[in-house]
């Protein structure tokens, strides 16, 4: 699932902006979150970039993260970047993305239900989330 997410977000800056909020840290590996955060920083650092290039992004991310990560973590990150660059989406790719979005909505609904239980919200908010 991690490579599906990276593939989708690497397609365009718009895709990253559109889908990043649905990708929760507990759903994907730590390296995936590092890469996604790096993509966001990459686009902010180079606003004129319109087409994502794995090679230049990899160099940017490794340079940026080398100050923060251990050697072992850098090796894991490099492996993840290499696999992400070579990833070819499979027939279930779209389903993976739908599942991520569904998981996010379910989490939001559960949080709102907790608020209803505590008395700080009402069922109208749950209904709005469930029907959007």
List each language-model region with its residue ranges.
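Noncatalytic partner-interaction/assembly domains of nucleic-acid and motor enzyme complexes
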Residues: 1-103
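Interdomain "pre-motor" coupling segment immediately N-terminal to P-loop NTPase/helicase cores
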Residues: 82-132
């Amino acid at each position: 699932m991690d490579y599906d997410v990276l593939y989708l977000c690497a397609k365009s800056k718009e895709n990253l902006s559109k889908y990043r909020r649905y990708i929760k840290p507990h759903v994907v590996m730590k390296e995936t979150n590092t890469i996604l955060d790096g993509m966001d920083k990459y686009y902010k650092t180079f606003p004129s970039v319109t087409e994502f290039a794995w090679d230049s992004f990899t160099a940017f991310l490794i340079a940026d993260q080398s100050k923060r990560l251990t050697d072992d973590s850098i090796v894991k990150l490099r492996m993840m970047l290499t696999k992400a660059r070579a990833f070819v989406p499979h027939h279930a790719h779209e389903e993976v993305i739908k599942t991520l979005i569904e998981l996010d909505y379910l989490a939001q609904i559960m949080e709102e239900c907790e608020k209803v239980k505590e008395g700080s919200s009402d069922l109208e908010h749950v209904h709005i989330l469930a029907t959007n």
